[in-house]
C-alpha cells in the first residue's frame, strides 16, 4: 500500500469529487492538507508551539492543537469589520473520537497503521511477479503524511462515497504540491448556506468533502444523521441533519456510546442512550405534578372556607348569647324594684306577729282518752 500515493490521489480527486453525490466541502489550502512536519513548523510560526512532539500526544490533544491552529489562522487573517459582522470562525466540532482511540498516542496509532498496511503491501509486491524483481517501495514516515490522510486511515473521519469514486477516476492527473496556507476571509467561512456562497463555488475551487465518523451518507440506510461536515479554507457548509439515534457503521468502531468524553459533540440528540428517557414521559410527569398542585390548592381553599364558616357561626352564637344575657339582667332589675315598692307593709306585719306571739299558735295533736276493756 503506497501511503503517499493515497494522499496524492485524495488531492487529485478533489475537483471531480465536488460534482458527484452529496455536497462536498471546500478544504483547499486548509490545515488538513499539511504534513506533520509542515504543521509543526506552522505552529512554530504562529507562536503556538506546544513544546511537545506530536508522537507523544494522544489523539485528543492532536485534535485540540489542530483546532487551535485553525482559530489562530482565522483570527490572524480576519479584519475587524468582518469579525464584527460575521462573528469569526469558531472551533469545529465535526470530528469525534471513539473512546478506545482517544487515549492512544499518535505513535501508537501510526504503528497500528503500519502493521495494517504491511500485509497489503507484501501481497501487492508478490502479485506483480515476473521475470524482473521489483524494487521495494519506501514507506513514508509520520512526518511526510498529511493530517487528513492520517485522520482518514486512523478512523477519525471517512471520505464521501462520491468523492472516492471521483478520486479513482482522476488518478491519472499530476500530483499537486502542498501549498502554503493563504489568508482566510471570515466573510466566506460560515456554518450552513446562509448567504450567496453555494456548493458550486466550492466545487469550482477544487473542494472535496469529508464527514466525521458516525455521520451517515444519504445512500446508507443505517438511520444515522444524514449530512456532511468538513473544514476548509474557502467555505464551510453544514447540511441539515436528522437527530435520530442509530448505530455507527464499521468505520466508527462501535456505537455512539464509545465517543470520547473530551471530544466536542457535533450534533444535538433529542433522545438519550442511558438514564431517564425524555419526551413523553417527562411531559406526563410534569402534567401529573401540575394536577397534584391544583388539587392541593383546591383542598386548601376548601379548608379555609370551612374554617371561616365555623368561625362566623361561633361569632353569631356568642352575639346571641350576649343579647339574651342583657335581657335577663334587665328583667332581674325590674323584679327587684317591684319587690322594694309593693311588699314593704307585708314584711312589717310579719315582724309584728312574730314579736307578739313568740311561741306561735298551739299545735293540735291527738290525745289518748280510753283504753279498750279487757
Swiss-Prot record:
Work out whether the entry's keyword set contains Metal-binding.
no
Q: Supply the induction statement.
A: By abscisic acid (ABA).
Region annotation (Leucine-zipper) maps to 314-335
InterPro entries of this UniProt entry? bZIP, BZIP46-like, bZIP_sf
* One GO MF term attached to the UniProt entry: DNA-binding transcription factor activity
- GO-annotated biological processes: abscisic acid-activated signaling pathway; positive regulation of DNA-templated transcription; regulation of DNA-templated transcription
* Domain of life from the UniProt record: Eukaryota
**Renumbered residue ranges of the record's region Basic motif:** 288-307
Q: What is its main location?
A: nucleus
Which stretches are tagged as biased composition: Basic and acidic residues? 1-13
Tissue spec: Expressed in roots, leaves and embryos.
Q: Where is the composition biased (Low complexity)?
A: 14-23
Where is the stretch described as Disordered? Answer: 1-23, 117-142
UniProt entry tagged with the keyword DNA-binding: yes
Free-text function comment from the UniProt entry: Transcription activator that mediates abscisic acid (ABA) signaling. Binds specifically to the ABA-responsive element (ABRE) of the EMP1 and RAB16A gene promoters.
The record's similarity note reads: Belongs to the bZIP family.
Name of the protein:
bZIP transcription factor TRAB1
State the species of origin: Oryza sativa subsp. japonica
The gene coding this protein: TRAB1
